[in-house]
Amino acid sequence: MPLSRLIINDFRNIETCDIQLSTGFNFVIGPNGSGKTSVLEAIYLLGHGRSFKSSLTGRIIRNSCDELFIHGRFTTPEQFELPIGINKQRDGTTEVKIGGESGQKLAQLAKVLPLQLIHPEGFELVTDGPKFRRAFIDWGVFHVEPAFYEAWSRVKRLTKQRNALLKTAQSYRELSYWDLELANLAEKIDQWRVDYINHISEATQQICQAFLPEYDIKLSYYRGWERETPYAELLKRNFERDKQLGYTVGGPNKADLRIKVAGTPVEDVLSRGQLKLMVCALRLAQGQHLTEATGKQCIYLIDDFASELDSHRRQLLAQYLKQTKAQVFISSITAEQIADMHDEESKMFEIEHGKIAQG
C-alpha cells in the first residue's frame, strides 16, 4: 500500500513540502545537513508516531513553531486513496487521523502503514541488547497476528502489577490468581513468536546466501525462560527469588533472537558492511513474509544508502529491493551513488536547506 503523496509542515528544518511519490523507488538527494534524512524521518513518524532520531518532540518541531504536521495519502489494495495524518505539539500532545477520523491510536497507524527502516545506526538490531531483537520479532507478529497487540499489552500490565505485588506479598497465594492469566498469555505470545521465527528463518537464510555466501548464518529463538518449563510453574518456583529482587526475572519480556555463524555471534565475525547486509536480509525477509501472509507490502526507508556498502553490495541490495516490488525511499549524498537504480518509474528529489524540488 504505497504512499502517493507526502505533505510535511514545520518538521526539523523543513517548513513545508508537498510531493507526489512513485510507487517504486523515491530518491532524496542532498548534502549533509540538507534535510534528506528528515524526509525519511517524517515518513517514519507518520507510520510509528515517533521519530527514529529523537525521543524529544521539541527537537523535531521546527524552531519557533509550536507544532508539526505530517500528512500522507496511500493507495489501498482496492485502489482507493486513504488520507492519514499526525500532528504533534511541543507539550507532547499527539493527534492521529486515519480516513479523516480523529482520535485514532498509534497502533492503528502502524497497522495501516507497515514500515521497514534501514539506517546507519541500524546495527543495533544485531549488536546491541535483546530489546532490539524483541522489537523486530514483535513488529512481525503484530502485523500477521491480529490478537497479538492486545495480548502483549496485557502481559506488560500484568508483569508491572506483579512486580508491584512482589514488594508486599507475604505468600505466593497473593499472586497466584494474576499469575494464571499472565502465564496463559505468555505461552500464547511465545507460540506466536516461535511460529513467526520459523516462517522468516528460511527467507533470511536464502537472502544471506546471496548477500554473504561465505557464511552459514543461523537464527535461533530464546523465549525468555527454559523451554522445558511451563511459565506458570516458573513463576511459582521463582517467587522467593523474584520477591527478593523486586521484579520478575524470566518471561516473554526477556525473549531474544540469536544470530550466529558457526556458533559464534555474528557481531564477532562480520565486518560493518557485512553486518549492514545482515540487517537488510532480516528486514527484507520480514517484508517478504508480510506480503505472503497478508498481501500487504512494506514501505522501505533506507537512510544513507551508500554507508558501509561498496558498489557490488549496493547493487545486490538494489536488486532485492526491486524484486519486492515495494515502495522504497532512499537518501543519498550524491545522485551518482544511486545512478544504476534510477529508472523511468522512479522519482528523484533534491533537497537543500530544507527546500525540496523534484529532480
Swiss-Prot record:
One of its GO terms (molecular function) is single-stranded DNA binding. It holds the Pfam family SMC_N. GO terms for biological process: DNA replication; DNA synthesis involved in DNA repair; double-strand break repair; SOS response. ATP binds at residues 30-37. PROSITE patterns: RECF_1, RECF_2. GO terms for cellular component: cytoplasm. It is found in: Cytoplasm. Keywords: ATP-binding, Cytoplasm, DNA damage, DNA repair, DNA replication, DNA-binding, Nucleotide-binding, SOS response. PANTHER family: DNA REPLICATION AND REPAIR PROTEIN RECF. This is DNA replication and repair protein RecF. The gene is recF.
